[in-house]
């Protein structure tokens, strides 16, 4: 059995207009994230992990922030595109682990909804998707509530 592991990482700064979209879910918060697309830092990290596992570069290569076509783009559409590339190469996702690093907003009330959206978009069982959150104990830019960072690790298996 052939397997591939991908790691994704993304950061966005607070300061944009609401809504704040994380993992395809609108999370109530006073500001959004500054981004060329919809700023969904969770789905961006997952997309990067999938592309990395497939040795296809990163989301900046596929959806450059200099291209007006992707201005305000729905990150769910971008994620589905990245996953379709993997499917076209004969791979599907076995499991996904995501860590949201943010002092605010509190993520716990939104985790299950985020897992459901990701599972639907990746045509996967929700039990194969883990999303968790942590803080940096008020240290660094996330601790000062200046932005959100996300790491994602994906295991892809040859179909």
Curated annotation (Swiss-Prot):
Cofactor(s) listed in the protein's UniProt record: a divalent metal cation
Catalysed reaction, written as an equation: 4-CDP-2-C-methyl-D-erythritol 2-phosphate = 2-C-methyl-D-erythritol 2,4-cyclic diphosphate + CMP
Record text on cofactor binding: Binds 1 divalent metal cation per subunit.
Protein keywords: Isoprene biosynthesis, Lyase, Metal-binding
Transition state stabilizer (site feature) positions: 36, 135
Binding site for a divalent metal cation: 10, 12, 44
Gene Ontology MF term list: 2-C-methyl-D-erythritol 2,4-cyclodiphosphate synthase activity; metal ion binding
GO biological processes: isopentenyl diphosphate biosynthetic process, methylerythritol 4-phosphate pathway; terpenoid biosynthetic process
Annotated metabolic or biological route of this protein: Isoprenoid biosynthesis; isopentenyl diphosphate biosynthesis via DXP pathway; isopentenyl diphosphate from 1-deoxy-D-xylulose 5-phosphate: step 4/6
Pfam families listed in its UniProt record: YgbB
Binding site for 4-CDP-2-C-methyl-D-erythritol 2-phosphate: 10-12, 36-37, 58-60, 63-67, 102-108, 134-137, 141, 144
Record-linked InterPro entries: MECDP_synthase (IPR003526), MECDP_synthase_CS (IPR020555), MECDP_synthase_sf (IPR036571)
Enzyme nomenclature, EC number: 4.6.1.12
Origin: domain of life: Bacteria
Function: Involved in the biosynthesis of isopentenyl diphosphate (IPP) and dimethylallyl diphosphate (DMAPP), two major building blocks of isoprenoid compounds. Catalyzes the conversion of 4-diphosphocytidyl-2-C-methyl-D-erythritol 2-phosphate (CDP-ME2P) to 2-C-methyl-D-erythritol 2,4-cyclodiphosphate (ME-CPP) with a corresponding release of cytidine 5-monophosphate (CMP).
Family stated for the protein in its record: Belongs to the IspF family.
Complex formation: Homotrimer.
Designated name of the protein: 2-C-methyl-D-erythritol 2,4-cyclodiphosphate synthase
UniProt source species: Shewanella piezotolerans (strain WP3 / JCM 13877)
Gene name of the record: ispF
């Amino acid at each position: 059995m052939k397997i591939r592991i991908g790691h994704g990482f993304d950061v966005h700064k607070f300061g944009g207009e609401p809504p704040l979209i994380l993992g395809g879910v609108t999370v109530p918060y006073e500001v959004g994230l500054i981004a060329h697309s919809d700023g969904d830092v969770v789905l961006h990290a997952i997309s990067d992990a999938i592309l990395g596992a497939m040795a296809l570069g990163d989301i900046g290569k596929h959806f450059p922030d200099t291209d007006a076509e992707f201005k305000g783009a729905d990150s769910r559409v971008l994620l589905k595109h990245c996953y379709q590339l993997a499917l076209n190469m004969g791979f599907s996702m076995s499991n996904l682990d995501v860590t949201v690093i943010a002092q605010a907003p509190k993520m716990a009330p939104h985790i299950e909804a985020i897992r459901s959206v990701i599972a639907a978009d990746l045509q996967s069982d929700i039990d194969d998707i883990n999303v968790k959150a942590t803080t940096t104990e008020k240290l660094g830019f996330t601790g000062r509530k200046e932005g959100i960072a996300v790491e994602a690790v994906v295991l892809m298996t040859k179909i």
